Amino acid sequence: MSTEWAAWSATMRPPQLQGRWALAGYQPGRGPVFGQVVITAQGDPNSGEFTTETTFTYARGGQTVNRRGRGLVYTGFQWRGRSSGEATSFPIRGVSTDWRESLFVDRDWRGAEGRWFTGAYNELGLDVRLRRVGADPIVLGTAESMIKTGASRQELHLFGANFPSSATPADVNFGPGVTVDRIVSATPTQMVVSVSVAPNASVGRRSVIVSGATGEASVAVYNTIDFIKVRPQSGLARLGAGAAFQKQFQQFEAIAYAKGPDGKADTKDDVELGLVDALWTIEEFTATFKDDDKDFVGEIDAESGLFTPNIDGPNPKRKNNANNYGDVWVVAAYPRSAGRDAAPNARPVKGRAHLLVTVPSYIMFDQPEVAR
C-alpha cells in the first residue's frame, strides 16, 4: 500500500456529486460539444449510485443530443457508467447507441474528466470534462477555433454557464489586438460576440475571459493556414466477419496550423488552429510490387473522414484469394473545393496519415458482463 493511498483512504467519504455540471467535450472529426449533465443520487447515500440526464450541442453543426444514464462511483473517485440516447453522434449502421462512461472525479468533487465511448472495440467516443456549476461564470469554449488578423465583424459563439444576461463588450476579453465590437446575443449558457482583429495582432492562442472568469477556453489568432496534419498519424481498423466479429472503424480529422515566429513548419512554435473541413481520399501505401490494397481494404467518407473497413475474405478478386487486409495512406485536402477542383491553379493544403487495416480480433478480453 502506497503512502498516497493510505492518506486518501483515511478520509474517503461517499461522493457528493448530485447537482448540475457544465459539460465540455470533443469528438474527433466533429469538434467540440458543450452542454450540461444533471446528476441525481440514488438509493443509500453510501452506495455511490447516481442517474444522469445529459444535454449537449455540437458547436460546429448545431445538433443537440439528449441522453439518460446511470453511474457507479468506486473508491470515491472512479465513475463507471452507461447511457442511452439517439444515434446522432455516431450514425453508423450496427453501432450501439448505448455508451460506456469512464471518468476520474476530482478530490474536491468540483470536476471530472474522462471518456464516453461505444463501438465493438470502444473506438468511437468523446473526451469530456465536467465542472460543477455554482454561482460564478464558467467559460467552456468556443464554436470557432480561430480568428483571422485584419478581419472585422467576425462572430464567435461562446459556451459556458452563468453568463451575464446583460453583458457588454467590456465583459469579454481576448487580449491585445482583438476588439469586441458588440454582444450579438447572450443567454446564461451561450453568448455570440462580434470581434475585429488588428492586422498586426500577435499570432497565437488567446484565453477567453468572460466577466473575469477564464478556463481552458481559447481561440487562435492567425494570418494564414500554412499546413494541416491528419490525426491520428497512425490509424488502425479491423475487417468485419459478419455478426460474430464486428468491424473496427477509424475516424480521422484534419487540424490546421500556422507557422510560428521561426517561419518553419513542424517546429515547436507552430500554432495549432483547430479542426477544418477537408476532402478525404485513400492512396496506395506501396509496400510490394503492384500493391493494390486501396482497392480492397474499405472506404473513407469524403467529407467526414470516417473509414469503414471491408469484410474479411478470402477475396477471389485478389491475388492468391488473399484477405482484404492491407495498409494505405489517408489523405486530407483543404479546402474541400480546391481538393475537388482539377484546375491547375487549385492548390489545396494536404496532409496524410498511415492506416493499417487488419483482421478481426478473434479473442475479446472484456468479460461478457462488461458489455451489458
Regions found by a protein language model. Name each.
Residues 15-104, 115-118, 123-124:
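Central antiparallel beta-sheet cores of small beta-barrel/beta-sandwich binding domains
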